[in-house]
Amino acid sequence: MNIDRNRVIRCFAAYVRNFDRSDAGIVLKYQHSIRVSRIIEKLAHGISLSDADTDLAWCIGVLHDIGRFEQLREYHTFIDYRSVDHARYGAHYLFDEGHIRDFLSDASEDSLIRLAVEQHNVFRLPDGLTPRQKQFCQLIRDADKIDIFRVYVTQLAGTNNIWHTDLSRLKTQSVSESVMAQARRMRTIRTEDKKTRMDFYVGVLCLYFELAYPVSRQLADEQGYYDTLLQFHSQNQQTE
């Protein structure tokens, strides 16, 4: 498959211009998408994918969160269970509405791209995937997790962030029992179980447990954001 990267980026930037670029959440998701595309490219090289498959992985990285922009404009939140499943909406926008052709002329990998976009946020990948399908789904899920570590570190370092909270407030919050129980099992946390901001913080820490590839853990370690998250100390005795 032939992917024109300049066209993909140009069309993605044009799409994002339809939204309020003074909104910090829109800026965040645009930057996140670009960073995830770079991360997934590194992961693809790390597992020795072909040049064509590396380009395909990169493209999935750019497009994986395209549903976030309309979600934020319509619902003013990034929490799917309070609004819309952003991954499914992104797949709908790209494929049911036909906008994938804005980005790519070649339709030969449409089904794989749709699957990877649609499944990048699920709690567990479905059974029955082919090895190739599973590989691309795991790559985008790993790349997404790795950049989420950066997002949390950089957002919490600022006084004006998309969660309207800061470290001083976070340090006093408790962790819900169900979230702590899942964390002790070293598993990812179901979003609907998260009640406090500290629950979400613990949920981010637990993403590391399910990185699929050794190169993913290596890259997360090298970037240092995950280690920064681990340095957090709570003023809430139960949480600490």
Model regions and ranges:
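Active-site flanking loop/helix segments enriched in acidic
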Residues: 9-35, 67-80
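Divalent metal-dependent phosphate-bond-processing catalytic cores, especially two-metal-ion Mg2+/Mn2+ enzymes
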Residues: 2-3, 25-34, 38, 42-50, ...
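An active-site-proximal "capping" alpha-helix that borders the catalytic cofactor pocket
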Residues: 35-43, 84-99
